[in-house]
Amino acid sequence: MKVPALKLTGIALGMMLSAGAMATNPGTPGGEQPGTGFPAVSDFAASGPFSTTNSNVNTTCAVYRPRTLGENGLRHPIILWGNGTGGSPSTYGRLLEHWASHGFVVAAARTSNAGSGEEMISCLNYLVTENGRSTGTFDGKLDVNRVATAGHSQGGGGSIMAGQDSRVTVTAPFQPYTLGLGHRSSSQSNQSGPMFLMTGGSDTIASPSLNARPVYNRANVPVFWGELRGAGHFEPVGNAGGYRGPSTAWLRYHLMEDSNAEGLFYGSNCGLCSDRNWDVNRKGIN
């Protein structure tokens, strides 16, 4: 199925349509230091403690990262990012910088057609190689056993495709488009780790019922499906609006062992479960 080009090629214009100003971003309930040694934070939606930088490391990947890597022996988890159709890493630059400020190394595929997930895995291969070198920016400073895939729209579908790689720990697709554009439905039942499936209650481009519901039903892994009420398709553009805090919490919990983030998703009275801005379905998550 082909999506009308007028809807998907103008993602950058969606910043004007974002409902982010109306959405809440839950903070952490406490300040216990994550098990991996990264600093605790008091608000997942606020910038983290690391100063950041970004650059195009090759023709296929842009990397957003803490300016100084490996301080105090830290090994930084990896997030692979896929853009929506017509978008680029800079389209989502404030979100990617936000994650980098929390200590993640974010490798964004430099393609506007990320639906196959191939370019995202290419970025992972690059970082794994660089981490194994004896010298260089990334030498021995990355935790290649803690890897997430994330992306928006076509890139969200791509993040599910890339989520089949056995090196992937967890996924976080934003409003994934899963009806074509490189996406294969067989990937949905072949995931390597838990998924935070994010949709928008007012999304008319990647309709949750057509694009996300089948993913939720087919997934072979635990899924937290959170639908942000009132969010249109372009909410993730820029700083990701109401998705920023929860997505950061999900990644910190699974990649940094940040127990402060656990309560947003897990437990009988999880934070997002009782948040009036979110509609939640959980599968294999208690």
Residue ranges and their predicted role:
Residues S90-A109:
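Short amphipathic alpha-helix adjacent to the substrate-entry channel of hydrolases
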Residues T169-N239:
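The feature captures the conserved acid-bearing segment of alpha/beta-hydrolase catalytic domains
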Residues M1-G10:
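Bacterial N-terminal signal peptides that target proteins for export
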Residues T24-L74, S166:
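Short conserved active-site loop signatures built around small residues
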Residues G73-G84:
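Short beta-strand element of the alpha/beta-hydrolase
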Residues T68-R75, E118-G157:
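Gly/Ser-rich "nucleophile elbow"/oxyanion-hole loop immediately N-terminal to the catalytic nucleophile
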Residues S18-A19:
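N-terminal signal peptide c-region/cleavage motif recognized by signal peptidases
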Residues R229-G230, V237-N286:
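Alpha/beta-hydrolase-fold serine-hydrolase catalytic core, especially in secreted/extracellular enzymes
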